[in-house]
Swiss-Prot record:
Catalyzes the conversion of lactate to pyruvate. Beta-D-fructose 1,6-bisphosphate binds at residues 159, 174. GO terms for biological process: glycolytic process; lactate metabolic process. Its main location: cytoplasm. Keywords: Allosteric enzyme, Cytoplasm, NAD, Oxidoreductase. Pathway: Fermentation; pyruvate fermentation to lactate; (S)-lactate from pyruvate: step 1/1. The lineage of its organism: Bacteria, Bacillati, Bacillota, Clostridia, Eubacteriales. Belongs to the LDH/MDH superfamily. LDH family. It catalyses: (S)-lactate + NAD(+) = pyruvate + NADH + H(+). Disulfide bonds: none annotated. It comes from Clostridium acetobutylicum (strain ATCC 824 / DSM 792 / JCM 1419 / IAM 19013 / LMG 5710 / NBRC 13948 / NRRL B-527 / VKM B-1787 / 2291 / W). It is an enzyme of class 1 (oxidoreductase). This is L-lactate dehydrogenase 2.
Amino acid sequence: MNFVKNKLVVVGAGMVGSAVLNSVLSLNLLSEVVIIDINDNKAKGEALDASHTTSFAYSPNVKVRAGNYEDCADAQIIVITAGPSLKPDDKLDRLVLADTNVKVTDSIMKNICKYTKDAIIIVVTNPVDIATYYCQNNFDYPKNKIIGTGTLLDTARMRKIIGKKYNVDSKNVHGYVLGEHGGSSFTSWSDVNIAGIPFNQLNDIFKDHYKVDKDEVDKEVRDSGIEVLKLKGYTSAGIAMSVSRLVKAMLLNEQSILPVSSTLEGEYGINDVALSIPCIITSNGIEKKLEIPLSKDEVEKLNKSADNLKSIIKGLNTNK
């Protein structure tokens, strides 16, 4: 397959798709961006609006347009954002979207597969772990080329929370949130550190600042997305930046280690469910899944997260 160099397709022109479109353009790495939506006028409007930004200084002359699934044929990266999102008055659990959005994802994947099985697909649609599992296991598409955003945003939230409490730049906070992008996610505290200082020493070293409580941080991370949803009606900026981070790692073949969702195949003794663990991201997608050292309690939490997701997968109603 001959790709158009640095061509990206966004499927879905809703709040998230629009934010993703503008976020990836700001990378200044793309030659062409196509947006697809069931509402063609919405896609055209988003593309036209975004295209006007390319006239500003230091913006490359990117081709931005609305298109259709044929545009996937020579795309390097495809981002799936389509599907209903949680509303503030919904039951505030991403898993309630499972049946509906798996059907949406099924339709999208069937259309993509008509034209390519070479592009890297980034799955954003919630519940992202369920959607990622479905995409990886039902279309004979290379699994390493399908990546769910997973707990990448949760990890950014955790780092921001800890950085703020200790009054340090959150980019100097290291560690991961693992498992489900949702209620059973957890921070791998055994790996969290600031400048190499392990978490269990941080309260002593930063004794003039807030004493960080693990359970409090985990709850704040899990509640962050819901809090944004309640306040503004939807989430968009954080997840769009998460997508941009992945796109940059792929286009530049960075070999970056990021916590993303993929079907586990024996890692930590877990099989046949997609959830987030650290993965090496390259121009091929997921190059390698890493079993970082976890405490016994953290492995138990990962298994609990897996069991939670498996129960949803088992109960899916995928009648088309």
